Amino acid sequence: ELLQDGNNVLIVGRNPKTLEETGKELAGAATYSCDAGKAEETTGLVDAVKNGKIAGFGDNVDGLILCAAVFPNPATKTSVVQPEPEELQAMLDSNVTAYYRLVKEFLPLLAPGSRIVLIGSTSGIRRDRGGIYGISKWALRSYAYALREECKPMGIGVSLIIPGGTFT
């Protein structure tokens, strides 16, 4: 609908092949390959948008819809003690820190009336079997609530959408 309404849409993904296929399906959308869990790649994305290196984008952004996620090893997905600390850190980098970094960088480009939409997970609500993925989505939920309060005086809305089970 955003494209149909004449908006510029930028789709960002870490898998170039999937990104290319999605770009073909959504004619008119710009695409950019980036692993949101890697700081240097998100810095490149922000630079490309701010400096007009992506057609239709420049020094203002009307909204953000952030839906980054990595999932745990299937063998330990419900555990909070079996995964290695590095696996938890990688999950936090993609599922929480990437959102934080992108919002921080794009916030100055958002005008009053803009909206930030964060895609969470029911694992951020459930108290059982969420494993380290649940830890990351609980953290994202907390961040979304705090961000909403901080952005209110700026006239920027923040929504956390918690869909049922999906694959991103």
Briefly describe each language-model feature range.
Residues D59-A69, N95, L118, S159:
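Rossmann-fold scaffold of SDR-type NAD(P)-dependent oxidoreductases
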Residues G157-F167:
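Conserved SDR Rossmann-fold cofactor-binding beta-strand/turn motif
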Residues V81-Y100, V117, L140:
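Catalytic Tyr-X3-Lys loop
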Residues G56-N60, A69-Q89:
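Conserved mid-core segment of classical short-chain dehydrogenase/reductases
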Residues E1-V9:
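Canonical Rossmann dinucleotide-binding motif of NAD(H)/NADP(H)-dependent dehydrogenases/reductases
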Residues L26-E40:
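Rossmann-fold cofactor-recognition segment
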Residues V70, R115-A139, A144-Y145, E149-K152, ...:
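Catalytic loop of short-chain dehydrogenase/reductase
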Residues N51, D93-S114, E149:
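Amphipathic alpha-helical dimer-interface segment in Rossmann-like NAD(P)H-dependent oxidoreductases
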